[in-house]
């Protein structure tokens, strides 16, 4: 039987009237169910997003709190390290020395000609220069830290160089006595030592003579001088520890100004030590007058040179029988040397620091600098080319004769007059530059 169009349409109409409401109801239920599922999913997503945002905010809050606490701890630790941390040499207030006026002395430049210099060798520092029998001797060292430092006593005549003696540590000074014996001051991490070098057919042996005073180890011994009567004078820069070498000890005393530097005399015949002078803010150099009756001592922190009788006992810098021979120096004096004609040569390690002396009466900033470490301290002091690296003065009347200048900046650690020349220990330790006088 064939179904026509009309019959087909009637069947569809009857089916739609019979089944349609149920289909519509099913679709409506399905749509509502889907909408409810979507709503629940949306709520869950919103809840998840809100929870994630809350967790993120809580985490950020905890992070900010932790960062604040950490920052406060760092600031407190920094404040403790720079301001409150105990140090071995707490700074002391002092009165800044006066500034000397221009002396009008002849200005002399150190020679740039290599022919005027004495070749030394590959070393990192020079602490002392002496001349004897036409030869020049220099104490030079290698080693960035004192624990690794080795020092040689180098002899040169301008053409040939030889290390005649070697010691562990820093050989800060040496001097020949009237009998030709060699006296040395050596600094090691354990402390300072006054030594004597004896030579025989087997070689040269170094004997420790003085290692402590009144049961306490010697500090950083900085210089040695021998008198015509056989007495050996030696200086201790300060009471600070010697673990970083002489230069750092002097720099520490310069900032702390503890006034614990001393000069001692060792009597070889009596095998006894007496204190000559105390209260020095960095005893950095010694020299004897040609007649051996007057001892000159450079005071680093006070920018002066003291003059005391060579046979003095228990004097105090600036006190009775201690004369301020030179004051208001333009730099911080180091090594001294006196020639037979009565001229005293003063070398300068650093130029006067206006920052340091501006804070002389206060200990806060100097204490911070002392706690800040060696790298920062090294940047506080320098010897620029416009400042004299050394000067010469007549011992008889204290008149200034020469001011020496170098074309390269750098501290001068040693000075030695030899006939018509003066040799210097400078930052260029490959050679010893000179100046004609």
Where are these regions (language model features)?
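Hydrophobic single transmembrane helices highlighted by the model
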Residues: 1-25
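Exposed, low-complexity/repetitive linear segments and helix-based recognition motifs
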Residues: 4, 44, 52-54, 336
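Terminal non-domain segments
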Residues: 51, 74-75
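Short, Lys/Arg-rich cytosolic juxtamembrane segment immediately N-terminal
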Residues: 54-66
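Sequence-structural signature of mature extracellular/luminal beta-sheet repeat domains
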Residues: 71, 77-437
């Amino acid at each position: 039987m064939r179904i026509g169009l009309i019959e087909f349409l009637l069947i569809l109409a009857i089916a739609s009237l019979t089944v349609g409401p149920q289909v519509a109801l099913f679709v409506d239920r399905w749509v509502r169910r889907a909408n409810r599922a979507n709503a629940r999913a949306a709520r869950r997503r919103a809840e998840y997003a809100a929870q994630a945002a809350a967790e993120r905010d809580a985490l950020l809050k905890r992070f900010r709190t932790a960062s604040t606490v950490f920052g406060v701890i760092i600031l407190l630790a920094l404040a403790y390290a720079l301001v409150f941390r105990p140090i071995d040499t707490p700074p002391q207030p002092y009165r800044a020395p006066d500034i000397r006026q221009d002396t009008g002395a002849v200005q002399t430049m150190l020679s740039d000609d290599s022919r005027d210099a004495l070749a030394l060798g590959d070393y990192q520092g020079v602490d002392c220069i002496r001349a004897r029998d036409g030869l020049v001797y220099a104490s030079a060292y290698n080693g960035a830290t004192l624990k690794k430092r080795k020092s040689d006593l180098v002899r040169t005549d301008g053409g040939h160089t030889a290390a005649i003696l070697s010691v562990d540590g820093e050989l800060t000074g040496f001097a020949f006595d009237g009998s030709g014996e060699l006296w040395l001051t050596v600094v090691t991490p354990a402390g300072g030592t006054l030594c004597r070098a004896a030579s025989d057919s087997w070689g040269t042996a170094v004997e420790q003579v003085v290692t402590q005073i009144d049961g306490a180890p010697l500090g950083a011994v900085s210089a040695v001088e021998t008198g015509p009567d056989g007495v050996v004078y030696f200086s201790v820069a300060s009471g600070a520890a010697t673990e970083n070498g002489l230069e750092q000890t002097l720099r520490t005393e310069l900032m702390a100004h503890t006034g614990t530097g001393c000069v001692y005399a060792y009597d070889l015949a009596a095998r006894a030590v007496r204190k000559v002078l105390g209260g020095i803010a960095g005893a950095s150099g010694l020299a004897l007058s040609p007649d051996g009756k007057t001892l000159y001592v450079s005071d680093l922190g006070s920018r002066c040179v003291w003059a005391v009788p060579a046979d003095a006992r228990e004097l105090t810098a600036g006190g009775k029988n201690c004369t301020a021979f030179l004051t208001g120096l333009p730099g911080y004096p180091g090594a001294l040397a006196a020639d037979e004609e009565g001229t005293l040569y003063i070398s300068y390690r650093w130029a006067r620091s206006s920052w340091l002396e501006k804070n002389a009466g206060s200990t806060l900033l100097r204490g911070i600098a002392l706690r800040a470490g060696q790298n920062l301290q090294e940047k506080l002091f320098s010897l620029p080319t416009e400042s004299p690296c050394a000067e010469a003065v007549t011992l008889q009347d204290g008149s200034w004769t020469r001011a020496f200048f170098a074309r390269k900046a750098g501290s001068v650690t040693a000075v030695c007059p030899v006939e018509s020349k003066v040799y210097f220990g400078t930052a260029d330790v490959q050679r010893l530059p000179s100046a004609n006088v």
